[in-house]
Amino acid sequence: MCSIMGYCSCDVTYDDFKAAFERTKSRGPDDTRVIFTGKGLLGFHRLAIMGLHPEGMQPFELDGSAVVCNGEIYGFERIKQILQQKGYSFQSQSDCEILLPLYKEYGTAMFRMLDAEFALILYDAEEQAFVAARDPIGIRPLYYGYDEKGSIVFASEAKNLVGICGKIMPFPPGHYYKDGEFVCYRDAAEVSSICHDDLETVCKNIREKLIAGIEKRLVADAKVGFLLSGGLDSSLVCAVAQKCSDKPIRTFAIGMSEDAIDLKYAKEVADYIGSEHTEVYMTPEEVISSLETVIALLGTYDITTIRASMGMYLVCKAI
């Protein structure tokens, strides 16, 4: 989780941009960088996961172009090797460093090539224009709006755009923006063919895809931890991850000191798979005192979202 922002014109001062961008500093506490592209500003708050050294800091730049990306590019090593064979060199181990060379080679067709969850803003120096894109499912957040002069502005969270844009809208998943238009490059709901496999084959395929999906998300330079509630979803993820690991994975669970049903079942799962397990206890007082902070971070007063996020916030804070 990082934070990105792009102001696609010179109608904003550096100080005003920085003030708006600072509202999501919590998404990327490790480092911050803002650059002027000549046609606008790009900002990046970093939470280092891949390529932990300073060379992995964004925005990445190439021949005057620049990009900021909040995302994970799966299988980037294979793409990197192909680009190296074409003569490109890389300075870091960051998965996102491949994006500018990839764009230079394939343009907006690159988005269909990515196995990734991402939101990005790219400045194309050759065309002196901005491009933005979001993954097909919309896993990574991205919002946009227009300032009073009609210039488009992109950001990871809506709160970055408050006071700049009169109307703030979610960037459509599976689309890229270029030349004033939003173009769908992949519709996740589109049915290309109807499957008639028997139940056994379907179950086998689901199992294989689940394992593959978990395995590719274990690739990181930073330590990987797992939130375990004891429910079906988190228990399956942790069990598969433990099978893929040659040492105990780190699992974390949270609950109240009384009637902690999640803690009970999480411990049963942790004991069964052999993880290194940590229990975090929260009190009613902690929940109440954290309420305003959680609402501010979420940017919503939706009761269901707030209730579901409270335990997540407190366990992540403890970690």
Describe the function of each predicted region.
Residues 49-68, 117-121, 163-170, 212, ...:
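Acidic loop->beta-strand submotif enriched in PP2C/PPM serine/threonine phosphatases
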Residues 41-46, 66-70, 132-133:
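Active-site-proximal beta-strand elements of phosphoester/diester hydrolases
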Residues 3-10, 17-29, 66, 76-97, ...:
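N-terminal segments that mediate ammonia production and transfer
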Residues 93-127, 136, 314:
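Catalytic core of PPM/PP2C metal-dependent serine/threonine phosphatase domains
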Residues 34, 59-60, 90, 114, ...:
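Short clusters of hydrophobic/aromatic residues that line enzyme substrate/ligand-binding pockets
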Residues 8-16, 85, 105, 126-131, ...:
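ATP-dependent adenylate-handling active sites, centered on carboxylate activation for C-N bond formation
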Residues 43-54, 136:
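Short Ser/Thr-interspersed hydrophobic loop/turn segments at strand-loop and sheet-helix junctions
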Residues 28, 71, 99, 177, ...:
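Residue-level signal for inorganic ion chemistry
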